[in-house]
């Protein structure tokens, strides 16, 4: 089972 490359998600806007 090959794991997909996880890309760093952009931080959500702090509201």
From Swiss-Prot:
Signal peptide: none annotated. GO terms for biological process: defense response to Gram-negative bacterium; innate immune response. One of its GO terms (cellular component) is extracellular region. It comes from the Eukaryota. Induction: By bacterial infection. Keywords: Antibiotic, Antimicrobial, Immunity, Innate immunity. Antibacterial peptide active against Gram-negative bacteria. This is Metalnikowin-1.
